[in-house]
């Protein structure tokens, strides 16, 4: 009996995949594709037309993961599900419909170049080899075990179009070899080496902007990566646009500044290293395809001309970022990161300034001490004045959720709602700190921003008031987004690092877990493990988290507009007990260890006695970070032990300073 397949396919590779399945004797029960985008140049074959010629049922749903489609696919009882250049991720319920496996064909040699547009990216980066990979599908994009690969060499003259042709041939060869073996159950997968993984996001036309300060070879690679049928690399000549379709790199730039015309026939431009000869291009989006020499005449370029637009000649205005809660953990680290380059002016408000004293002398840092519930006129004025608003003020410690639930609601929801409405009023971009807490008691193995259910406990468990306050604001912001509000929601997962909070906060129970544990070590009291400390969390170094947040603020090509992004480290999962044990190990080895009492042991306590009757806990909280990888090219890299060490060192030095002050 022929194996039955359901296929998700688009592009030439989609056609190749379908033809290979038919050639291998597979029964294709249904095909899912995309309707062509009228704004996109469709230089590739049509999956829908191929299906029509073969009488194969074809569909183009907006959401293939909708339960109705999953139910229909499940009824087809496919042995296999295949994805060939289909542009949407397929969820676990859909993948589970395949009795023998779900496989994807990806256009690179995985684990390198996961994500979008791998053929373009390998050219941009000057690679000499790529390939195609058939791999098992898992929830995380392009991360499943590898079934088969075929290598493709990249020549120095390849363009995106010629490389695509090579990949198409390689895909046909790979599938013709592997599909019969797959049907016989003779192929298995090899896990990917995560240490070699790289991930790239989608490319947009704006990514084709030519920066003449770069080496000529790098610009040549960019041009061939995005030349026709893609939108092309471009630069400005005065107020006009020059699209470069063909070029070559040469050594030497005659000592000229980047962007200077060295000669007009051939049209040769000085680069940061070497020079670029423009062989062909066009003027504007609707111009004729012209030689470089004719382009020089059309633009009036002569030796010594500068390819700089009028905007580049003006000093760029810094982006004005308003941070409410600037003295807090995220606020002070974020300010420090943004002030490291000269693109931002930071305006901040908070009720204290101890964590930002080191920043107050910076010329681009502007601080006022104030309360967001009182200084509303200052806040409204600065929202109107600034470009980006981050309302970071919140009560975010679990004991306060049960101890002061109304105060949590008033501050975390009501005061922040006012700020959101000011952003709507003045059409300002808001980057709102949602929270991993919104996932509540979700049972997914990892929490996905777009598909995971947000589940909380009964009303008498006041612990959830923080979660639902944040969730409701997420929903309000999303609704305003449908009316034009520019926004991004980010969800931090257990960020840790220096200046997390204060030992004094831990003394009254109002601090994060690691600060409580360190306080016990400092004071020689037993480390209290709530419900045995079996709860697992994924801890994220603040430096990793802030880098992701900085990229969200940068928002290159609008990639983060209207998005929800988890920022966490799924590889740094540990139970609270394991966190305490690692803290103890590093504490005993720390140079300051001799200044503190002996370790008093671990003590298990019941959660209601520690937090109160309104508390309820969750067993795990692990983020999916596919959105962060694909939208902002972010992957965390700092191991948990390093983060624990930095955090411990900060608090031990704080404790020593307290002792010195008491003398």
Curated annotation (Swiss-Prot):
The keyword Oxidoreductase applies. GO terms for biological process: lipid A biosynthetic process; lipopolysaccharide biosynthetic process; response to antibiotic. Keywords: Antibiotic resistance, Lipid A biosynthesis, Lipid biosynthesis, Lipid metabolism, Lipopolysaccharide biosynthesis, Multifunctional enzyme, NAD, Oxidoreductase, Transferase. InterPro entries: Arna-like_SDR_e, Bifun_polymyxin_resist_ArnA, Epimerase_deHydtase, Formyl_trans_C, Formyl_transf_N, Formyl_transf_N_sf, Formyl_transferase-like_C_sf, Lipid_A_modif_metabolic_enz. The record marks 104 as: Transition state stabilizer. The active site is at residues 106, 437, 621. It holds the Pfam family Formyl_trans_N. Residues 317-663 are annotated as: Dehydrogenase ArnADH. In the N-terminal section; belongs to the Fmt family. UDP-L-Ara4N formyltransferase subfamily. It catalyses: UDP-alpha-D-glucuronate + NAD(+) = UDP-beta-L-threo-pentopyranos-4-ulose + CO2 + NADH; UDP-4-amino-4-deoxy-beta-L-arabinose + (6R)-10-formyltetrahydrofolate = UDP-4-deoxy-4-formamido-beta-L-arabinose + (6S)-5,6,7,8-tetrahydrofolate + H(+). This is Bifunctional polymyxin resistance protein ArnA. Pathway: Nucleotide-sugar biosynthesis; UDP-4-deoxy-4-formamido-beta-L-arabinose biosynthesis; UDP-4-deoxy-4-formamido-beta-L-arabinose from UDP-alpha-D-glucuronate: step 1/3; Nucleotide-sugar biosynthesis; UDP-4-deoxy-4-formamido-beta-L-arabinose biosynthesis; UDP-4-deoxy-4-formamido-beta-L-arabinose from UDP-alpha-D-glucuronate: step 3/3; Bacterial outer membrane biogenesis; lipopolysaccharide biosynthesis. PANTHER family: BIFUNCTIONAL POLYMYXIN RESISTANCE PROTEIN ARNA, UDP-D-APIOSE_UDP-D-XYLOSE SYNTHASE 2.
């Amino acid at each position: 009996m022929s194996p039955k397949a359901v296929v998700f396919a688009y592009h030439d590779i989609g056609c190749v995949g379908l033809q290979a399945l038919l050639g291998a004797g597979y029964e294709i029960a249904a095909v899912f594709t995309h309707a062509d985008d009228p704004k996109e140049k469709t230089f590739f074959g049509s999956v829908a037309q191929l299906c029509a010629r073969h009488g194969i049922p074809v569909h183009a749903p907006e959401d293939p993961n909708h339960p109705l489609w999953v139910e229909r696919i499940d009824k087809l009882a496919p042995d296999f599900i295949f994805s060939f250049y289909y542009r949407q991720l397929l969820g676990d319920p859909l993948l589970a419909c395949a009795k023998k496996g779900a496989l994807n064909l990806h256009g690179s040699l995985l684990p390198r170049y996961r994500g979008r547009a791998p053929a373009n990216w390998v050219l941009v980066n000057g690679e000499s080899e790529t390939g195609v990979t058939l791999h098992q599908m898992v929830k995380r994009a392009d991360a499943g075990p590898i079934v088969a690969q075929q290598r493709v060499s990249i020549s120095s003259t390849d363009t995106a179009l010629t490389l695509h042709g090579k990949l198409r041939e390689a895909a046909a060869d790979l599938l013709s070899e592997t599909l019969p073996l797959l049907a016989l159950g003779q192929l298995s997968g090899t896990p990917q080496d995560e240490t070699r993984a790289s991930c790239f996001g989608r490319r947009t036309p704006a990514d084709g902007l030519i920066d003449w300060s770069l080496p000529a070879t790098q610009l040549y690679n960019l041009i061939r990566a995005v030349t026709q049928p893609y939108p092309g690399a471009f630069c400005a000549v005065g107020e006009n646009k020059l699209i470069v379709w063909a070029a070559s790199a040469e050594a030497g730039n005659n000592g000229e500044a980047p962007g200077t015309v060295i000669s007009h026939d051939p049209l040769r431009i000085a680069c940061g290293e070497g020079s670029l000869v423009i062989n062909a291009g066009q003027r504007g989006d609707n111009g004729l395809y012209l030689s470089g020499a004719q382009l020089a005449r059309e633009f009036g370029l002569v030796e010594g001309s500068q390819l700089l637009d009028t905007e580049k000649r003006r000093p760029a205005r810094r982006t004005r970022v308003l941070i409410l809660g600037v003295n807090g953990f995220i606020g002070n680290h974020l300010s420090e990161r943004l002030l490291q380059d000269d693109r931002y002016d930071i305006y901040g408000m908070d009720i204290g300034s101890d964590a930002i004293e080191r920043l107050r002398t910076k010329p681009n840092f502007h601080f006022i001490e104030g309360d967001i519930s009182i200084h509303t006129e200052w806040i409204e004025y600065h929202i109107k004045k600034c470009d980006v608003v981050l309302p970071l003020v919140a009560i975010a410690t679990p004991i306060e959720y049960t101890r002061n639930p109304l105060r949590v609601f008033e501050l975390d929801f009501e005061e922040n709602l006012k700020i959101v409405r000011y952003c709507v009023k003045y059409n300002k971009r808001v980057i709102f700190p949602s929270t991993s807490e919104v996932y509540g008691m979700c049972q997914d193995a990892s929490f996905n921003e777009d598909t995971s259910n947000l589940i909380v406990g009964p009303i008498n468990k006041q612990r959830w008031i923080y979660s639902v306050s944040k969730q409701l604001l997420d929903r309000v912001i999303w609704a305003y987004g449908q009316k034009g509000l520019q926004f991004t929601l980010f969800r931090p997962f257990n960020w840790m690092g220096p200046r997390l909070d204060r030992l004094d906060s831990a003394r009254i129970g109002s601090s994060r877990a690691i600060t409580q544990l360190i306080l016990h070590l400092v004071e020689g009291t037993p480390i209290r493990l709530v419900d045995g400390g079996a709860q697992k969390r994924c801890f994220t170094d603040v430096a990793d988290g802030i880098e992701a947040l900085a990229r969200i603020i940068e928002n290159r090509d609008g990639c983060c507009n209207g998005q929800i992004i988890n920022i966490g480290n799924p590889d740094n999962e540990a139970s609270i007990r394991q966190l305490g044990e690692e803290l103890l190990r590093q504490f005993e080895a720390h140079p300051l260890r001799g200044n503190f009492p002996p370790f008093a042991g671990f003590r298990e306590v019941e959660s209601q006695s520690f937090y109160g009757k309104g508390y309820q806990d969750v067993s795990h909280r692990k983020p999916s970070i596919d959105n962060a990888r694909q939208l902002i090219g972010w992957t965390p890299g700092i191991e948990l032990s390093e983060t624990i060490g930095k955090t411990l060192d900060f608090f031990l030095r704080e404790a020593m300073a307290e002792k010195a002050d008491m003398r």
